Structures are given as C-alpha cells and as structure tokens.
Amino acid sequence: MSRAKELQEKLNLQAKLQSTFSNNTAAVLDWLKESDETGISNDTERNKQLKDHKELEDGKKAFFKLPVLQIGSGLHFRTQDDASAKEDIHTIGEFIEGDKKVSSLAKKKKRSDPGLQRNNMYRITKDDTKAMIALKRKMRKGEKEGLRKKQEHSKSSVSNSYSASDEEDEDAGTMPQKSTKKKFGLLFDKKKKARK
C-alpha cells in the first residue's frame, strides 16, 4: 500500500508544480500584453533599436568572415583557389554554419609557393629519405671543401706576391719575436684548503 501512496504523492506534487508554472506563464503573458498596448511612444526609440540591431548583425557578419588558422600554418590571403580549398575550413562562418569536416583543420599543408621555399638544394627536409639526406650532406661537404681549397689557393698566391718584396726587408733587420706561454688559473691545480 505504501507504493500506491508514493505514486499518489508524486502525482499531487506534479499537479501543484504544473499549476504554479501555468500561473507564472499567465502573469508573464499579461505583462507582455500591457507592453504591446502601450507600445513604443517615440519613433526615435524605435530607430535607435533598429540601428543597434543592424550594428549587431554587421558585427556578427564581420566575425563570421574572420580567418581560421590550420594547425602549424600561418595566415595567408591567397586569391587563387586550390583543389583542397573547397574541402577546408577557412573562416569562422564556415566552421560554425558549414557542413565541412573539422578534421581538415588538423591537416598540415605543404607549402606550394615557390617564393616561400628556400633556394638551398642542400637543405634537409622532413620528407627526405635517409639516402637523400646522406647525399645532401656529402654534396654539402664537397662544396665546403671546394671553397676551402679555393680560399687556401687565393691566400697562397697573395702571400707569394708579398714574399718576394718581404725578403729584401727581412735581410735588413730581423727581430726575434718572443712568445710567452699563457697561464690559466685552473681550480684543480690549486691545493684545497684544509677544513677546520
């Protein structure tokens, strides 16, 4: 019998709650009718409300036109249409209202602009294989050695031209040069002070 009492109490409570809600709704509807009857007395107030509403809509449109950045990329204002651009999300409006996939934001795009790529053929990129990396390093090393040899050759030719004129001056008066050994005060050479 207690189960039946519980159900009856719940039904009574629901009825009271529904009655309270309907009374509140009726009171609010009465307030709205009164405000409609009095209306807006001034056209300037109405114009102000329309102006505020228009500003709000313009702000909303401007917000929806803001660009969305893909992960790992920067802002670019490209006017050309790519094949993948139709699938990607580029503005906040496309993100909120569009049916495009959000996963397109996570895709890292490869730079296709030749102006953005550096003209260094020895630069190692993440797409290079181990063999290509080894080849690029070998080519870079060969280039460095070639430059080094070229520099040494140019230094030796310059020093040879000066050496002929210097031989005459050296015979006239050669002074021995003294070189002193540099001393560094290293900590491990010093004896440690005894602790008291």
UniProtKB/Swiss-Prot annotation:
Ranges for region Disordered: 101-196
Keyword Nucleus carried by entry: yes
Domain of life per record: Eukaryota
Biased composition (Basic residues): 179-196
Compositional bias (Basic and acidic residues): 142-155
Main location as per UniProt: nucleus
The keyword Ribonucleoprotein appears for this protein: yes
Listed GO biological process terms: endonucleolytic cleavage in 5'-ETS of tricistronic rRNA transcript (SSU-rRNA, 5.8S rRNA, LSU-rRNA); endonucleolytic cleavage in ITS1 to separate SSU-rRNA from 5.8S rRNA and LSU-rRNA from tricistronic rRNA transcript (SSU-rRNA, 5.8S rRNA, LSU-rRNA); endonucleolytic cleavage to generate mature 5'-end of SSU-rRNA from (SSU-rRNA, 5.8S rRNA, LSU-rRNA); maturation of SSU-rRNA; maturation of SSU-rRNA from tricistronic rRNA transcript (SSU-rRNA, 5.8S rRNA, LSU-rRNA)
Subcellular location per the Swiss-Prot or TrEMBL entry: Nucleus, Nucleolus
Classification via InterPro entries: Nucleolar_19
GO cellular component: 90S preribosome; nucleolus; nucleoplasm; nucleus; small-subunit processome
Keywords in alphabetical order: Nucleus, Ribonucleoprotein, Ribosome biogenesis
Subunit annotation: Associates with the 90S pre-ribosome. Interacts with RNA helicase DHR2 and RNA helicase-like protein UTP25.
Task performed by this protein: Ribosome biogenesis factor required for cleavage of pre-rRNA at A0, A1 and A2 sites. Essential for the incorporation of UTP25 in pre-ribosomes.
Further remarks about this protein from its record: Present with 1460 molecules/cell in log phase SD medium.
Name by which UniProt lists this protein: Nucleolar protein 19
Source organism phylogeny: Eukaryota, Fungi, Dikarya, Ascomycota, Saccharomycotina
Gene behind the chain: NOP19
